[in-house]
Amino acid sequence: MSDIVVDDFSEKQAARLNKLSKRLHREVGKAIADYQMIEEGDRIMCCLSGGKDSYAMLDILLNLQKRAPISFEIVAVNLDQKQPGFPEHILPAYLDNLGVAYHILEKDTYSIVKEKIPEGKTTCSLCSRLRRGTLYGFAQRIGATKIALGHHRDDIIETLFLNMFFAGKMKAMPPKLLSDDGANMVIRPLAYCREKDIAEYAKFKEFPIIPCNLCGSQENLKRGAVKDMLKQWDKHHPGRIESIFTAMQNTSPSQGVDREQFDFAGLTRDPDAPMRGDVAESDLPAFDFLDTSNSGHIDLDAAKARSDLLSQQRIDIVSSYKP
């Protein structure tokens, strides 16, 4: 757990920060364990942008490093993309005070973006691709075995809907990803963390936040619309966002329509198979078993009991015809 200084906080604020810190550390620890993100001897390149998410990620990883049963190294890396007005002194001062190893890189991707993207258009996509390429190359240069990025649960869900709505794909951000060339392993330790928790934590910790819109680019309108949609769902339908994320971890290719993920053409029936009932497992109305007291998760025990009951019911033949 992070070391919390409570001198400047009221007792209520200190209690809230302690609870929030425990939750975030627990969620990061669980994500790391679930996806085996960090292993003995790893050198983790922690990408620090100056935003709330990457600050929180670095802070939590450093705290977990002190108590972890394995040994791993953390190196913070920031890429100065030469955006006008970028406060170059903030991150070095913060990292010096923290006592963590770090590198500040400089590469003028801003000029490239301004040259390629028409005035008034969102530059975020090209900017992030250029940044990613530079960071991937530097990770190999310093011998980093993992690249840690600060994407959280909201980012993952937003990306899922963006791809569904605008690209026709069921695709999100995996908590752990091997780069296309196989040279870099990307991890997202905040994958289980809610953005609103991270924002509150960052405010308590008083991280020296650097705004991401120094370039003058506006937020991607599509992502903004999806973010607003999810906020409304979270407000009016508690548990829905949690249920969506749970569903992303419980996919059933055989119950979908993607022929690349499941061999539908190869399906064959077994005429000698014992009868299990007149309701297929996939036809169970899962929504009948929503456990509203458990963040909207499905009550699997209730669903199975209902399935077993249906299987035991006798089928009465009330009419038949044979020509």
From Swiss-Prot:
<keyword id="KW-0694">RNA-binding</keyword>
<dbReference type="GO" id="GO:0000287">
    <property type="term" value="F:magnesium ion binding"/>
</dbReference>
<dbReference type="GO" id="GO:0034227">
    <property type="term" value="P:tRNA thio-modification"/>
</dbReference>
<feature type="short sequence motif" description="PP-loop motif">
    <location>
        <begin position="49"/>
        <end position="54"/>
    </location>
</feature>
<dbReference type="InterPro" id="IPR011063">
    <property type="entry name" value="TilS/TtcA_N"/>
</dbReference>
<comment type="function">
    <text>Catalyzes the ATP-dependent 2-thiolation of cytidine in position 32 of tRNA, to form 2-thiocytidine (s(2)C32). The sulfur atoms are provided by the cysteine/cysteine desulfurase (IscS) system.</text>
</comment>
<dbReference type="Pfam" id="PF01171">
    <property type="entry name" value="ATP_bind_3"/>
</dbReference>
<keyword id="KW-0004">4Fe-4S</keyword>
<keyword id="KW-0460">Magnesium</keyword>
<feature type="binding site">
    <location>
        <position position="127"/>
    </location>
    <ligand>
        <name>[4Fe-4S] cluster</name>
    </ligand>
</feature>
<dbReference type="GO" id="GO:0005737">
    <property type="term" value="C:cytoplasm"/>
</dbReference>
<keyword id="KW-0963">Cytoplasm</keyword>
<keyword id="KW-0808">Transferase</keyword>
<keyword id="KW-0411">Iron-sulfur</keyword>
<feature type="binding site">
    <location>
        <position position="215"/>
    </location>
    <ligand>
        <name>[4Fe-4S] cluster</name>
    </ligand>
</feature>
<keyword id="KW-0479">Metal-binding</keyword>
<comment type="pathway">
    <text>tRNA modification.</text>
</comment>
<keyword id="KW-0408">Iron</keyword>
<protein>
    <recommendedName>
        <fullName>tRNA-cytidine(32) 2-sulfurtransferase</fullName>
        <ecNumber>2.8.1.-</ecNumber>
    </recommendedName>
</protein>
<dbReference type="GO" id="GO:0016783">
    <property type="term" value="F:sulfurtransferase activity"/>
</dbReference>
<keyword id="KW-0819">tRNA processing</keyword>
<keyword id="KW-0547">Nucleotide-binding</keyword>
<dbReference type="GO" id="GO:0000049">
    <property type="term" value="F:tRNA binding"/>
</dbReference>
<dbReference type="InterPro" id="IPR014729">
    <property type="entry name" value="Rossmann-like_a/b/a_fold"/>
</dbReference>
<dbReference type="InterPro" id="IPR012089">
    <property type="entry name" value="tRNA_Cyd_32_2_STrfase"/>
</dbReference>
<dbReference type="GO" id="GO:0051539">
    <property type="term" value="F:4 iron, 4 sulfur cluster binding"/>
</dbReference>
<comment type="similarity">
    <text>Belongs to the TtcA family.</text>
</comment>
<comment type="subunit">
    <text>Homodimer.</text>
</comment>
<feature type="binding site">
    <location>
        <position position="124"/>
    </location>
    <ligand>
        <name>[4Fe-4S] cluster</name>
    </ligand>
</feature>
<keyword id="KW-0067">ATP-binding</keyword>
<dbReference type="GO" id="GO:0005524">
    <property type="term" value="F:ATP binding"/>
</dbReference>
<keyword id="KW-0820">tRNA-binding</keyword>
